[in-house]
Amino acid sequence: MPNVVVVGAQWGDEGKGKIVDLLTQYADVVVRFQGGNNAGHTLVVGGEKTVLHLIPSGILHPGKSCVIGNGVVIDPEVLVLEIDRLKAKGALKDDGQLVVSLDAHVIMPWHKAIDVAREQAMGEGKIGTTGRGIGPTYEDKVARRGLRIRDLLDEARLARKVKERAALAREELARLGAKLELDEPALVKRYAELGRRVAGYATDVSIWLHRALQQGKSLLFEGAQGTMLDVDHGTYPFVTSSNTVAGNAVVGCGLGPTAVDYVLGISKAYSTRVGGGPYPTELKDETGERLRKIGGEYGATTGRPRRTGWLDALALRYAVRVNGLSGIAMTKLDVLTGFDTVKIAVGYRLDGKVLDEMPSDPEVIERCTPVYEELPGWTEKLEHLRTWDDLPPRARAYVKRVEELAGVKVVGCSVGADRGETILVENPFLAR
């Protein structure tokens, strides 16, 4: 069986969790490789909703292993809370199901304080951070002063590092006009306890995954956020603090690029974005509100209403290119039911010219207006449909047009919130 990477092809919130949950039955191991608990996966199985922020979606499948790689930043309070909630639901019966990298960096209280203080200091220039300390934790990682999961397992080492790093954090917060109220001995005690709680799951993930591959096991890499939020390839600076594209899948868990056989991009049938930054197809009218209401477009992590708009083919084609997408899974196709017409942005108008590729400068993107192609809508409900041929002709025509514009095949469509409400045209794990 091949190894498959699943990444967001838009601005995040594309429904990756549902698709990963669906594909997990074909994989042996699900791997999370970047981001932190700023991402939220909402899964609906048998009508029961589960929201996960750190642990991979595949944990709801008995017998599957889930790995949190070195590229993820971990809030140990959140990790332990998710473990406890899953156990209370009857999931994670076998502790061997969850594997956590010893080298994953740890979100500390000062990271959250710095995150919030900086955002407040930016005023109208706010990026729209979740305030969960993700960015400052990645900064400390790059500056070679971060704490890792392995540091929580040695209380003396933890105490030394907390003392050093807390002093630096207080200095930075003072410059921002904020204070860090911290009882260092109590903090060390608490995080050492958290370390003991996760110690049984922590290991060298690179070795663990390499052995899994040697045993012939198949891997499913689960991305967080989306392509347009990638720190290098997104609409910088309105991005997240990690690489969200497929190339980071192996870097974030300690494998080489030859471990990947197929890259699946997830895209909504329309588009959404959370936080600031350019968004050419944004709808600030009744249509945008209608998409938000029908699609339930509120953040799984923050509860913030998402910005909504029509599908942007230029952004999608960009995602195909920078990820090397093998195929696309389209989610929330059912949300478009009932619209008289549906639109796709096929170009940008800028200074009297029409562009057919997304500019690399976000300030230029901000000045662009979309050139739309309109297609007839459909009125039929889609939730009960399970095959491609069952879809209404106009819905099929819409999907095929997206396929033509993106340049890769749409291999699946989500027609409802539940795991089973999905049409899989081509299974990435069976593709050759």
From Swiss-Prot:
Major localisation: cytoplasm
Gene Ontology molecular function terms on file: adenylosuccinate synthase activity; GTP binding; magnesium ion binding
InterPro entries reported for this sequence: Adenylosuccin_syn_GTP-bd (IPR018220), Adenylosuccin_syn_Lys_AS (IPR033128), Adenylosuccinate_synth_dom1 (IPR042109), Adenylosuccinate_synth_dom2 (IPR042110), Adenylosuccinate_synth_dom3 (IPR042111), Adenylosuccinate_synthetase (IPR001114), P-loop_NTPase (IPR027417)
Residues annotated to bind substrate: 300-306
Residues binding GTP: 12-18, 40-42, 306, 332-334, 414-416
Obligatory cofactor(s): Mg(2+)
Pathway: Purine metabolism; AMP biosynthesis via de novo pathway; AMP from IMP: step 1/2
Subcellular location: Cytoplasm
Entry's EC annotation: 6.3.4.4
Catalytic activity reported: IMP + L-aspartate + GTP = N(6)-(1,2-dicarboxyethyl)-AMP + GDP + phosphate + 2 H(+)
Binding site for Mg(2+): 13, 40
GO biological process: 'de novo' AMP biosynthetic process; IMP metabolic process
Domain of life of the organism encoding this protein: Bacteria
Keywords, alphabetical: Cytoplasm, GTP-binding, Ligase, Magnesium, Metal-binding, Nucleotide-binding, Purine biosynthesis
Binding site for IMP: 13-16, 38-41, 130, 144, 225, 240, 304
Co-factor binding details: Binds 1 Mg(2+) ion per subunit.
Record flagged with keyword Metal-binding: yes
Active site per the UniProt annotation: 13, 41
A single Gene Ontology CC term: cytoplasm
SMART domains in the record: Adenylsucc_synt (SM00788)
Tagged with keyword Nucleus: no
Family: Belongs to the adenylosuccinate synthetase family.
PANTHER family: ADENYLOSUCCINATE SYNTHETASE
Name of this chain's protein: Adenylosuccinate synthetase
Organism per entry: Anaeromyxobacter dehalogenans (strain 2CP-C)
